[in-house]
Amino acid sequence: MDKNYIKAAIEAILFAWSDPISSSELSNILDIKVTETKEIMKEMIDEFNFHKRGIQIIQMNDHYQMSTRAEYHEILQKLFEPKQNKGLTQASLETLAIIAYRQPITKTEIESVRGVKCDKAISTLFEKNLIEDRGRLEKTGRPILFGTTLHFLKNFGLKSLEDLPKITEIDQANEEELIKDIYNQQLKGR
């Protein structure tokens, strides 16, 4: 494999996989030697640092993770400041519907259903206390499992998850419409 292709693949893996990943896991995925992976990771870390990019690759023992640079903390903090009195966006509603019907579920599984990244939606749902961390999945990387909260049930006027409309005859694409309808009904009742 071409070295530039390997670097691009590693960058994609680190971006998609938010948890630290070991050089041996990267090697297995890319079907290259661990020594080659470590050499390429060293080069990539140096390149990211040399160009002072907004993101960096950090190394923790034999694990690697992509993160933002500390000097952009204040800027990023503004992005994640709680937005008061804002409703849920379409993306947040879709993400919430997927979590409600398929919990416990990982971020990767949610993104697989939605077809797009869901970091902002998950952050918003956590901020509004509609979802919570339900532990870790026992597989490589131990991704977080998400589920809905009691606050979710209260806000949507549900006694339990069994009160969610049944989707046996409804296709998966309409899950978010069900949550949106419940959400809109609750807003009208206030």
From Swiss-Prot:
Query: What biological process terms from GO does the record include?
Result: cell division; chromosome separation; DNA replication
Q: Where in the cell is it found?
A: Cytoplasm
Q: Which UniProt keywords apply?
A: Cell cycle, Cell division, Chromosome partition, Cytoplasm
Q: Is Kinase set as a keyword in this record?
A: no
A family per Pfam: SMC_ScpB
Q: Spell out the InterPro entries in the cross-references.
A: ScpB_csome_segregation (IPR005234), WH-like_DNA-bd_sf (IPR036388), WH_DNA-bd_sf (IPR036390)
Q: What is its main location?
A: cytoplasm
Which GO terms of the cellular component aspect does the record hold? cytoplasm
Q: How does it assemble?
A: Homodimer. Homodimerization may be required to stabilize the binding of ScpA to the Smc head domains. Component of a cohesin-like complex composed of ScpA, ScpB and the Smc homodimer, in which ScpA and ScpB bind to the head domain of Smc. The presence of the three proteins is required for the association of the complex with DNA.
**Sorted alphabetically, which HAMAP family does this protein's record hold?**
ScpB
Q: Tell me which family the UniProt entry assigns to this protein.
A: Belongs to the ScpB family.
Please give the function described in this protein's UniProt entry: Participates in chromosomal partition during cell division. May act via the formation of a condensin-like complex containing Smc and ScpA that pull DNA away from mid-cell into both cell halves.
Q: What is this protein called?
A: Segregation and condensation protein B
Provenance organism: Alkaliphilus metalliredigens (strain QYMF)
The primary gene name is: scpB
